[in-house]
Amino acid sequence: MFKINRILRVFLPLVPLGFALAALPACHAAPATPDAEALLKRSDAFRNGWPSYVVRVKITDYEAGKSDEEHLYQVSQKGTEKTYVDFLSPREKGEHMLMLDDDMWIYLPGTSRPVRITPLERLTGDASNGDVARTNYAADYSPVFVRTEKAAGADCYVLQLTARRKGATYQRILYWLRVPDARPVRAEFYLTSGKFIKSATFDEYEMSAGRMVLHKLTLYDEIRHSSHSVLEYSGAAPHNLPDRLFYQGNTNMF
């Protein structure tokens, strides 16, 4: 009897502790942080569907809600370092733009040599040269995962991109990618000073040559708030582009 009482004195005080532990919520491991580099590369596939390809880009500029100008370009891109842009609108006929690595030039009819330009310079409306000719973000920016939140009704990963090469168009980008497939949804663009200058919505996608690619992008001026430009992409398809197309000294081609 003495032995039983002794056991009870030891065991009974532990009973409430056992119930308390059982009532605690189950512990779960913290979710793994998404791989920002992998997400950025996946997102680039929606804008650059093939290693070597051609796409037409129509840009319509709006001022105070009214259509102002319209421009047409043919963009030929090979890898992440070479882009050739042919200006197709009648009043710009004969103009061309070339990107090689971190350098860009524009050729204007009547001039003897190409003029060096920067990706950030205005092409038309709210579109910069780099918005058309430099769209491989994984090559130009270092990404960091920031958070997960909803944008345009979809769960999105938010990445912060910081320029890692001098040819990058912007110093910093906040980039919203849809959780299931890393499809771009929204972006905010910042200068080196930290100034927020432009935003973008990735509005429509379509199947082209067997790939889901970007069809419509809208760029908004975040300084004046009175203008925006709509970029519509069509005919995107893989092409075996010759290296001579990207030769800066070839004035017949450039």
PLM features per residue range, with description:
Residues 56, 75, 87, 91, ...:
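Ribonuclease/tRNase effector modules and their secretory precursors
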